[in-house]
Regions:
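Short beta-strand edge/turn micro-motifs at domain boundaries
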Residues: 117-141
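Flexible low-complexity loop/turn motifs enriched in small/helix-breaking residues
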Residues: 11-116
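Hydrophobic membrane-insertion alpha-helices, especially the h-region
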Residues: 1-10
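Intrinsically disordered, low-complexity segments enriched in small/polar residues
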Residues: 8, 93-96, 127, 137-139
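Short N-terminal secondary-structure initiator segments
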Residues: 3-4, 75-83, 122, 134-138
């Protein structure tokens, strides 16, 4: 019985656990671009984008509009200079009104390079007339 219990605990400990968002600190600045509900949806889009990160927890998600706009400007410049920015391309195709940069801090059971990273999103129209956040790219910004 003790051996079975030890094996069960070992399997539970090693079994990949889903992304934990139960203790996430969410920091959203005042926004002139997006409604509160849209920014709430942005946070949920990030959780969905990171759902594959097993044995990780999201410690903080931050949207700072001024910082986001500065990065959008840099990504547009990078794209215009031929450096292949996914966000810059999306902004040139759809306009900058839907562009947002989100900062995500994570802790994982085993260290991964992408624990703390930046995600670039566009709020894009869908066939049914709604708008949905679409991840354009991410990196260790």
């Amino acid at each position: 019985v003790v051996v079975v219990a030890a094996v069960a605990v070992g399997v539970w400990w090693l079994w990949p656990k889903p992304l934990d968002t139960s203790h996430t600190k969410v920091e959203i600045s005042a926004s002139s671009k997006f409604k509160t509900a849209q920014l709430d949806d942005l946070v949920q889009a990030s959780y969905r984008a990171n759902a594959g990160m097993k044995n990780c927890s999201v410690d903080k998600v931050k949207y700072d509009e001024r910082q986001s706009e500065d990065i959008v400007d840099m990504e547009i410049d990078s794209y215009d200079e031929g450096h292949g920015s996914a966000l810059g391309r999306a902004v040139r195709e759809h306009g900058r009104d839907g562009a947002a940069v989100l900062f995500v801090d994570m802790t994982c059971q085993e260290h991964v390079d992408d624990e703390d990273h930046v995600e670039w999103y566009m709020l894009l129209p869908q066939d049914d007339g709604t708008k949905t956040w679409v991840l354009q790219d991410w990196g260790n910004g």
